[in-house]
């Protein structure tokens, strides 16, 4: 899924768990992708390209069991929950951040071709909806999702514009008929990974900047019945 729409998922997390600060939530929704970038640059995971790259379906996420397998994401989310909920004694934060981490693989399963493994060491079967086999439809669906996140969050028009413009900016990557610099990525998967890393950062910064004034930073703003972390009382 386009990085800006993963970033937009943070808006849903804030709507459900408003007591969690903006930066940890933004980092959590893209933690899986940060690992993917690092593992590709280090050669631990492998991305390949067709001799000519015209759109995203000419780039193949050939081997990514450590960052993008279902089991690896579950372990990563549980680790985040244990560290935050148990060691830092912030159970609501831990739950929110674990859900944020898990959201990444859920959204990728909804859009990717069959390139997501069940677990490291299990190469088959691989999972994905296959939506990226029809790139323009994928971009349309992704953009709708980003706009829906904005609507649930009740964000500003500037935030909406950021989400829409980031998606439109990716149009050459989703539409082979629209000229763009994507052809330069042929045979250069590590450059592709580095570009994705930069794109992630820009997306997170943009969403964070334009959402910050409406970010629900007080647990008192949580929906009725939602748990909130409270400071411990001495002697209890």
Q: Where are the predicted features?
A:
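N-terminal membrane-targeting hydrophobic helices
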Residues: 1-236
């Amino acid at each position: 899924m386009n990085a800006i729409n993963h970033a937009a998922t943070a808006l849903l997390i804030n709507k459900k768990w408003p007591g969690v600060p903006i930066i940890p939530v933004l980092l959590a929704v893209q933690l899986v992708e940060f690992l993917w970038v690092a593992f590709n640059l280090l050669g631990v995971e492998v991305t390949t390209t067709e001799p000519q790259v015209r759109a995203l379906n000419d780039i193949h996420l050939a081997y990514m069991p450590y960052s993008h397998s279902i089991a690896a994401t579950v372990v990563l989310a549980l680790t985040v929950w244990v560290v935050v909920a148990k060691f830092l004694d912030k159970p609501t934060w831990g739950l929110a951040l674990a859900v944020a981490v898990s959201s990444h693989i859920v959204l990728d399963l909804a859009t990717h071709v069959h390139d997501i493994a069940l677990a490291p060491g299990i190469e088959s079967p691989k999972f994905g909806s296959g939506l990226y086999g029809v790139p323009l439809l994928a971009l349309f669906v992704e953009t709708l999702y980003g706009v829906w996140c904005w609507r649930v969050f009740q964000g500003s028009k500037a935030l909406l514009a950021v989400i829409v413009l980031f998606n439109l900016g990716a149009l050459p990557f989703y539409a082979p008929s629209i000229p763009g610099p994507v052809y330069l990525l042929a045979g250069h998967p590590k450059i592709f990974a580095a570009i994705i890393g930069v794109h992630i950062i820009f997306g997170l910064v943009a969403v964070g900047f334009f959402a910050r004034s409406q970010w629900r930073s007080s647990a008192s703003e949580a929906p009725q019945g939602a748990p909130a972390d409270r400071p411990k009382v001495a002697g209890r």
